[in-house]
Protein backbone atom coordinates (compact mmCIF):
# COMPACT_ATOMS: atom_id res chain seq x y z
CA UNK A 1 0.00 0.00 0.00
CA UNK A 2 1.36 3.39 -0.98
CA UNK A 3 -0.04 5.62 1.80
CA UNK A 4 -1.98 5.74 5.03
CA UNK A 5 -3.97 8.95 5.48
CA UNK A 6 -4.57 9.78 9.15
CA UNK A 7 -7.24 12.21 10.34
CA UNK A 8 -7.40 13.04 14.06
CA UNK A 9 -10.85 14.28 15.08
CA UNK A 10 -12.37 16.05 18.06
CA UNK A 11 -15.87 17.49 17.70
CA UNK A 12 -15.48 18.06 13.97
CA UNK A 13 -19.07 17.31 12.91
CA UNK A 14 -19.31 20.52 10.90
CA UNK A 15 -16.59 19.57 8.46
CA UNK A 16 -15.47 15.95 8.99
CA UNK A 17 -17.65 14.42 6.26
CA UNK A 18 -16.39 16.91 3.65
CA UNK A 19 -12.81 16.31 4.79
CA UNK A 20 -13.17 12.53 4.47
CA UNK A 21 -14.95 12.81 1.11
CA UNK A 22 -12.10 14.97 -0.23
CA UNK A 23 -9.72 12.13 0.64
CA UNK A 24 -11.90 9.46 -1.02
CA UNK A 25 -11.94 11.66 -4.18
CA UNK A 26 -8.15 11.50 -4.63
CA UNK A 27 -6.67 10.63 -8.02
CA UNK A 28 -4.19 8.35 -6.17
CA UNK A 29 -6.29 5.52 -4.72
CA UNK A 30 -3.59 3.24 -3.26
CA UNK A 31 -4.21 4.31 0.33
CA UNK A 32 -6.06 3.49 3.51
CA UNK A 33 -7.83 6.07 5.66
CA UNK A 34 -7.50 6.00 9.45
CA UNK A 35 -9.67 8.31 11.56
CA UNK A 36 -8.92 8.67 15.27
CA UNK A 37 -11.79 10.12 17.27
CA UNK A 38 -10.62 11.76 20.48
CA UNK A 39 -13.77 11.46 22.59
CA UNK A 40 -16.06 13.67 20.53
CA UNK A 41 -19.31 14.80 22.13
CA UNK A 42 -20.93 16.07 18.93
CA UNK A 43 -22.21 14.03 15.96
CA UNK A 44 -18.76 13.56 14.42
CA UNK A 45 -18.34 10.04 15.82
CA UNK A 46 -21.55 9.00 14.02
CA UNK A 47 -20.13 10.49 10.82
CA UNK A 48 -16.84 8.63 11.34
CA UNK A 49 -18.67 5.35 12.00
CA UNK A 50 -20.69 5.68 8.77
CA UNK A 51 -17.58 4.76 6.73
CA UNK A 52 -16.81 1.54 8.65
CA UNK A 53 -18.03 -0.72 5.81
CA UNK A 54 -15.15 0.34 3.57
CA UNK A 55 -12.25 -2.15 3.77
CA UNK A 56 -9.71 0.69 3.33
CA UNK A 57 -11.16 2.58 6.31
CA UNK A 58 -10.24 2.18 9.97
CA UNK A 59 -11.65 3.99 12.99
CA UNK A 60 -10.03 4.29 16.40
CA UNK A 61 -12.39 5.50 19.12
CA UNK A 62 -10.73 7.07 22.16
CA UNK A 63 -13.01 7.63 25.15
CA UNK A 64 -11.30 10.93 25.95
CA UNK A 65 -9.22 13.60 24.26
CA UNK A 66 -5.69 12.21 24.19
CA UNK A 67 -4.33 15.14 22.16
CA UNK A 68 -3.16 15.52 18.58
CA UNK A 69 0.20 13.78 18.95
CA UNK A 70 -1.10 10.73 20.78
CA UNK A 71 -3.96 10.36 18.31
CA UNK A 72 -1.77 10.53 15.20
CA UNK A 73 0.75 8.18 16.84
CA UNK A 74 -2.08 5.65 17.23
CA UNK A 75 -2.77 5.99 13.52
CA UNK A 76 0.91 5.69 12.61
CA UNK A 77 1.18 2.48 14.67
CA UNK A 78 -1.67 0.97 12.66
CA UNK A 79 -0.55 2.35 9.27
CA UNK A 80 0.32 -0.12 6.52
CA UNK A 81 1.40 2.42 3.89
CA UNK A 82 4.94 3.26 2.78
CA UNK A 83 4.02 6.86 3.58
CA UNK A 84 1.89 8.44 6.28
CA UNK A 85 -0.17 11.51 5.43
CA UNK A 86 -1.55 13.57 8.29
CA UNK A 87 -4.67 15.56 7.50
CA UNK A 88 -6.69 17.84 9.78
CA UNK A 89 -10.40 17.17 10.19
CA UNK A 90 -11.18 20.71 8.98
CA UNK A 91 -9.00 20.51 5.86
CA UNK A 92 -10.22 19.82 2.34
CA UNK A 93 -7.89 18.29 -0.27
CA UNK A 94 -7.71 19.00 -3.98
CA UNK A 95 -8.19 15.75 -5.95
CA UNK A 96 -4.47 15.49 -6.79
CA UNK A 97 -3.25 16.33 -3.25
CA UNK A 98 -1.95 12.87 -2.34
CA UNK A 99 -0.61 12.17 -5.84
CA UNK A 100 1.48 15.38 -5.79
CA UNK A 101 2.83 14.77 -2.28
CA UNK A 102 3.86 11.23 -3.24
CA UNK A 103 5.47 12.42 -6.48
CA UNK A 104 7.59 14.90 -4.53
CA UNK A 105 8.54 12.37 -1.82
CA UNK A 106 9.51 9.75 -4.38
CA UNK A 107 11.69 12.18 -6.34
CA UNK A 108 14.48 11.75 -3.77
CA UNK A 109 14.90 8.89 -1.25
CA UNK A 110 16.39 11.37 1.26
CA UNK A 111 13.11 13.30 1.53
CA UNK A 112 11.49 12.60 4.88
CA UNK A 113 8.51 14.97 4.83
CA UNK A 114 6.54 16.94 2.27
CA UNK A 115 4.38 19.85 3.40
CA UNK A 116 1.24 20.96 1.61
CA UNK A 117 0.58 24.53 0.60
CA UNK A 118 -2.36 25.14 2.91
CA UNK A 119 -4.73 27.92 1.88
CA UNK A 120 -7.05 30.02 4.00
CA UNK A 121 -10.63 28.86 3.57
CA UNK A 122 -12.23 32.30 3.26
CA UNK A 123 -9.24 33.87 1.50
CA UNK A 124 -7.97 31.09 -0.81
CA UNK A 125 -5.55 33.43 -2.55
CA UNK A 126 -3.62 33.61 0.74
CA UNK A 127 -1.41 30.93 2.26
CA UNK A 128 -2.11 29.62 5.74
CA UNK A 129 1.03 27.48 5.86
CA UNK A 130 3.71 26.52 3.34
CA UNK A 131 5.93 24.56 5.71
CA UNK A 132 7.65 25.82 8.81
CA UNK A 133 10.88 27.69 9.39
CA UNK A 134 12.87 28.63 12.48
CA UNK A 135 13.81 32.22 13.28
CA UNK A 136 17.28 33.26 14.38
CA UNK A 137 15.92 33.28 17.96
CA UNK A 138 14.78 29.66 17.64
CA UNK A 139 11.03 30.20 17.25
CA UNK A 140 9.15 27.99 14.80
CA UNK A 141 6.94 29.97 12.42
CA UNK A 142 4.47 29.20 9.66
CA UNK A 143 6.04 29.99 6.30
CA UNK A 144 3.81 32.13 4.09
CA UNK A 145 1.13 32.84 6.71
CA UNK A 146 -1.19 35.48 5.24
CA UNK A 147 0.91 36.04 2.12
CA UNK A 148 -0.07 35.46 -1.51
CA UNK A 149 -0.21 31.71 -2.15
CA UNK A 150 1.21 32.25 -5.64
CA UNK A 151 4.61 32.94 -4.01
CA UNK A 152 4.79 29.33 -2.79
CA UNK A 153 4.20 27.23 -5.91
CA UNK A 154 7.70 25.77 -6.29
CA UNK A 155 9.13 23.03 -4.06
CA UNK A 156 11.85 24.11 -1.65
CA UNK A 157 13.57 22.94 1.52
CA UNK A 158 11.74 23.66 4.77
CA UNK A 159 12.55 23.13 8.44
CA UNK A 160 9.43 21.06 9.11
CA UNK A 161 6.08 20.15 7.60
CA UNK A 162 2.83 21.27 9.22
CA UNK A 163 1.02 18.17 10.48
CA UNK A 164 -2.28 19.63 9.28
CA UNK A 165 -1.63 18.35 5.74
CA UNK A 166 1.73 16.65 5.24
CA UNK A 167 3.29 13.41 4.05
CA UNK A 168 6.00 11.51 5.97
CA UNK A 169 8.15 8.55 4.90
CA UNK A 170 7.10 5.79 7.33
CA UNK A 171 10.45 3.96 7.22
CA UNK A 172 12.10 7.07 8.66
CA UNK A 173 9.38 7.52 11.31
CA UNK A 174 10.01 3.89 12.28
CA UNK A 175 13.72 4.73 12.80
CA UNK A 176 13.50 8.12 14.53
CA UNK A 177 10.23 7.75 16.40
CA UNK A 178 6.89 9.45 16.17
CA UNK A 179 5.37 12.67 17.50
CA UNK A 180 6.17 13.80 21.04
CA UNK A 181 2.99 13.34 23.06
CA UNK A 182 3.77 15.99 25.68
CA UNK A 183 0.68 18.16 26.26
CA UNK A 184 2.64 21.30 25.31
CA UNK A 185 3.24 19.97 21.80
CA UNK A 186 0.56 20.93 19.28
Residue ranges and their predicted role:
Residues 116, 135-158:
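Short, flexible, basic/aromatic active-site loop/helix in glycosyltransferases
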Residues 92-135, 139:
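Conserved donor NDP-sugar-binding/catalytic core segment of glycosyltransferases
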Residues 126-127, 147-171, 180-186:
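A recurrent flexible, glycine/aromatic-enriched loop bordering the glycosyltransferase active site
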Residues 62-79, 89:
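Glycine-rich, basic loop-to-helix element that forms the pyrophosphate-binding segment
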Residues 22-30:
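Short, acidic, metal-binding catalytic loop of nucleotide-sugar glycosyltransferases
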Residues 84:
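Short aromatic/hydrophobic "clamp" motif used to bind/position activated sugar donors
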Residues 22, 37-46, 64:
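A conserved acidic beta->alpha catalytic loop
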Residues 2-4, 32:
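Cell-envelope/extracellular polymer assembly enzymes that use nucleotide-activated donors
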Amino acid sequence: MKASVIIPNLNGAGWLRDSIESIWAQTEQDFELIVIDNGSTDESLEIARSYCGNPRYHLIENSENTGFSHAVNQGIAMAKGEYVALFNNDAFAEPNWLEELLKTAESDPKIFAVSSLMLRYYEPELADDAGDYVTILGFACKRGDGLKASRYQKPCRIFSACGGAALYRKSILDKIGVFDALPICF
